[in-house]
Amino acid sequence: MSEEQKFYQKFTQKKASKKEKQSFSKKEKSIKQHSSQICQSGTKTKTTQSKQHTFQENQNNKNKNYSKNDYANDYHLQNSLFSTKNIPSDAKKILEDFDQIVQSIRPLNSRQIQQLPDNIKMLSHQLTDKRSERRLGYLNDNIQLSSYVRYYTWWNLVRLTRLFSNLPEESFPQENQICLDCGTGPLTVIIALWLARPELRKHKLTWYCLDVSANSMIFGEDLYLTIAAKNPEFEPWKIIRVKGAFGTQIKQKAGFIICANMLNELNQNSDMPPEYQAKKYFQQFEAYGTAQTKFLLVEPGVPKASRTLSLLRTRFLEEGRSIVAPCPHAQECPMNGFKAYTGSSHKWCNFAFSTEDAPIKLQKLSEKAKLPKERATLSFLSVTEKINIEKKNSKSLEDKDDENSKELKRGQTLKCRIASDYFIVDKKQAFYACSKLGLTLIRTQAKSQSNGKISYQNYTEKEECLDKNNSLTSGDLIEVKIKTPAIHQNDEKTGAVIVDIC
C-alpha cells in the first residue's frame, strides 16, 4: 500500500471489528468493577455507565452517518468555462470552415498547400525550442504568416471562442467604447469576440489594434471584415491599426483592454523574471486606460505565464479593482505559479478542455504537421473597473468578515473553481480547486471501477445535486453548501484543504 493510500485511508471511517467490540466490553467490565470498589453512591456509578454508553452511542452514530455520506456537502454548478452549448451556431460554422475563408482571402496553390504541414512544423520550432533565432517581426514573412493563420490562429480561435462564450457579460466592452487589442497579430481576439458574443455585434466599438507586424494586421482585418460580412445586419467595428510594440502611445484612453498570448511572447524575449516584467506590464496597462477600464488577459497555460498573471492580479486588487474570473475570491492566489515556473512540481493556475469537438479539418492538419492536440490549455484574468470607495465602505462589517474569513460555518456556501482534471484518491474521484480557503482538494463520492470509469452510487436521494452522470471538468465553478466544517482536513501531499461533496 502506497503512502498516499495510507494517508487517505485515515479519512474512511469503518465499523468496529469483532475484536474491537470484545476489547471495549472488557474495558466496560473493568470500569464497573472499579466503580463498585469506590466508596461512592450508586448514583455516581450509574452516571459513569451512562456517560460511557452515551460516548459509544455517539461514536456509532458518527460511523453510521459517515457511511451514508452525511458528512459530504451538497453543491451545485454555477458555470463552466468551456461549455460548447454557449457557442453560437453561426460561430461553430465559421470555425469549421475557417480554412476556406482564409483560402478565399489569401489563396495557396496546390504545391503550397502540400508544403503547409512542413511550414507549420518549422514555425512551431521558431515559437518553441528555436525561439532565440526568431525575428521580432516574423509575421511579416508571407510564408510564416500564412502558416500561422492557417494553424495557430485557427487553434486560438477555438480556444478563445470557447472561453469568451462562457464568461459573464461584465467581462466585455460596452456600447461606444474605445478598445485596445495589444499584440493583435491577425486580429484573432477581435474575430473571436465577434463570433462568441453576438450581443457585441450591435455595439459601435472602436478598436485600436497594436502590433509590430503591419502585414499580419492587414491580413487580420481582411479576415475580420469577411467574417463580419456574414452578418450584414450588423455594421463592422471600426479598426485602427497601429504599428508598434507594447507601450506605443495611442490617441485615446481605452475603456476595454485585451491581449492574448502577448505577455508570453514578451517573457520569452526577455531574461528578466516575471516579478520584474509584471511591474512594467501593469504600469503600461494603467497608462493605456482609466479607473473605469476593464481588462481581459489570456495567456498559454504554462507556469511562467500563469505566474505573470498572478502578479498582475495582485496589483489590480491593490489598486481597488475586482476580479470577475476565474478567481472565486480576492484572497492571495494559492496557485501563483512561482514554484512551478522555477522547476518544482507545484500546481499553477491554468484550465484545459478536450479538443475532441475541434474542427475535424483542423485536427487532421495538426496530425499532418505532427503537432496533434488532445487538449487546449490557457490561463486568463478578467478585471473590472475600480470599486467606488463609498460603495466599498457601505458593506457591513459582517459581510466583510464573511468574505475575508477562512473559517467555515455550518450553512455557509463556499465557491470553488475546479483547476484540474479528475484523479483518484482512495478509489474516489477528486479534483484540485481554488477557493478562499486556498488550494482545495475536492473529493466526490464517485467510485473508480477497475476499467477506469467512474460510477455514482446512492444519489437517488439527492436529486438537488448536480447530475452525477456528468463529471465536473476543469474550469467549472461550483458552490458548496457547508454541512460539517469541523471535519475538514488537509491533504498531506499538497497541504490543500479537503472538501467532500456529494
Please give the residue ranges for each predicted region.
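C-terminal lobe and adjacent flexible extensions of AdoMet/dcAdoMet transferase-like proteins
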Residues: 355-502
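Class I S-adenosyl-L-methionine
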Residues: 306-314, 318-387
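A short SAM/SAH-binding and catalytic strip from SAM-dependent methyltransferases
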Residues: 254-275
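Conserved beta-strand signature within the Rossmann-like core of class I S-adenosyl-L-methionine
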Residues: 289-299
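Class I SAM-dependent methyltransferase Rossmann-like catalytic core
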Residues: 134-170
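Conserved SAM-binding loop of SAM-dependent methyltransferases across substrates and taxa
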Residues: 186-202
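S-adenosyl-L-methionine
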Residues: 218-251
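N-terminal auxiliary segments of SAM/dcSAM-dependent transferases
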Residues: 2-32, 39-134
